[in-house]
């Protein structure tokens, strides 16, 4: 994933949003208006997040396979830390 200019998340900060739904699909980009044959896989993710008032917002993004693999490794690290708590 690309480097973020945002400060790292502080676990003590007020995180008031709640994950409502997580959907993903594997896609294949096969062509574009500038390239006849791309043929590269990607992962499309859709998150539904509710704020403190209950309003649900949808966030969608795509990741290349290397970006997804990094994302997956980070979640495995989170799971390992949670298991020690």
From Swiss-Prot:
Q: What job does this protein perform?
A: Scaffold protein in the commander complex that is essential for endosomal recycling of transmembrane cargos; the commander complex is composed of the CCC subcomplex and the retriever subcomplex. May modulate activity of cullin-RING E3 ubiquitin ligase (CRL) complexes. Down-regulates activation of NF-kappa-B. Inhibits TNF-induced NFKB1 activation.
Q: Which organism is it from?
A: Homo sapiens (Human)
Which family is this sequence assigned to?
Belongs to the COMM domain-containing protein 6 family.
Location in or out of the cell: Nucleus; Cytoplasm
Recorded GO terms, molecular function? NF-kappaB binding
Q: Which UniProt keywords apply?
A: Acetylation, Cytoplasm, Nucleus, Transcription, Transcription regulation, Ubl conjugation pathway
Q: Which gene encodes it?
A: COMMD6
Q: Where is the COMM domain?
A: 18-85
Biological processes per GO annotation? negative regulation of NF-kappaB transcription factor activity; signal transduction
Report one GO cellular component: nucleus
Query: Which coarse location class describes where this protein primarily resides?
Result: nucleus
Task: Provide the protein name.
Answer: COMM domain-containing protein 6
For the modification N-acetylmethionine, which residues carry it? Answer: 1
Q: What is the effect of changing residue 24 to A?
A: Does not abolish homodimerization and interaction with COMMD1. Does not abolish repression of TNF-induced NFKB1 activation. Abolishes repression of TNF-induced NFKB1 activation
Q: Where in the body, by tissue, does this protein show up? A: Ubiquitous. Expressed in brain, heart, skeletal muscle, lung, pancreas, liver, kidney, small intestine and placenta.
Assembly notes = Component of the commander complex consisting of the CCC subcomplex and the retriever subcomplex. Component of the CCC (COMMD/CCDC22/CCDC93) subcomplex consisting of COMMD1, COMMD2, COMMD3, COMMD4, COMMD5, COMMD6, COMMD7, COMMD8, COMMD9, COMMD10, CCDC22 and CCDC93; within the complex forms a heterodimer with COMMD1. May form a homodimer with isoform 1. Interacts with RELA, RELB, NFKB1/p105. Does not interact with NFKBIB. Interacts with CCDC22, CCDC93, SCNN1B, CUL4A.
